[in-house]
């Protein structure tokens, strides 16, 4: 409601939507660059809505990262016209780096988790969904022809890094940031094999899944895994619905989030088994910390309330990896 009541926020939101649509529908690099600059300037007031120091710091980090990406985008897109220059040979790679920086993809992901940890859940939702639409569309529709091998290697790195580092986090917003990095790996793999429509479909499913999750976490003021215990005080319907969203986000069959991953597996199975293996390994690690969040949200039964919690945690350290690894066996059998 605060966005509607404030004229500044209403203007920022409308400009944010229009600038993204302009960028997606653009047929000119300069027009695309201008639309993405307008998008950047529109999102910063939304990030700083509560005027606290943490959100201001996150907005500054976001501005610096996106400004660097915009500079690389402008330089590379204009230099590609100069076919006689030796520098123009490196411009497609520079353009790729600019888009990956704006997307928050490996190896240009340095700003993304820290910004996510500094802003509100509503801003996190916009940053993880709407703000990725324009760079992801460019990545899917314009760039894969000359960068297939590079994109596949970056997709594998996204999946691995998102899973490995995400397992060591306790802050929910940081976990969701590394989860997003892992999902970017799956989207990039679809873009690399010339399936842009499948890439966008995966992105739409991802946005549908994170929207109720982020909104609920923001409503309940949950910022750490220990705050997940608040869910047990609400109705069992809300609790179970959020747990199902988490499992779906992890790609567990037969939930909705498994469908785009199954589609990716079928597309990559014939000729890119190594990349597929790495993607599945990263997805299993993602599922590990989703299960960790789910267990944190479950209340202990009465007969276990007097049991030492360290004993339970030690046993879960063995149970969770075994359960998570067993869930990933079926794709390997298909290979």
From Swiss-Prot:
GO terms for molecular function: NADH dehydrogenase (ubiquinone) activity. It catalyses: a ubiquinone + NADH + 5 H(+)(in) = a ubiquinol + NAD(+) + 4 H(+)(out). GO terms for biological process: mitochondrial electron transport, NADH to ubiquinone. It is a multi-pass membrane protein. It is found in: Mitochondrion inner membrane. InterPro entries: Complex_I_Subunit_2 (IPR050175), NADH_UbQ_OxRdtase_chain2 (IPR003917), ND/Mrp_TM (IPR001750). It comes from the Eukaryota. The keyword Transmembrane helix applies. GO terms for cellular component: mitochondrial inner membrane. Core subunit of the mitochondrial membrane respiratory chain NADH dehydrogenase (Complex I) that is believed to belong to the minimal assembly required for catalysis. Complex I functions in the transfer of electrons from NADH to the respiratory chain. The immediate electron acceptor for the enzyme is believed to be ubiquinone. This is NADH-ubiquinone oxidoreductase chain 2. It comes from Lumbricus terrestris. The lineage of its organism: Eukaryota, Metazoa, Spiralia, Lophotrochozoa, Annelida. The gene is ND2.
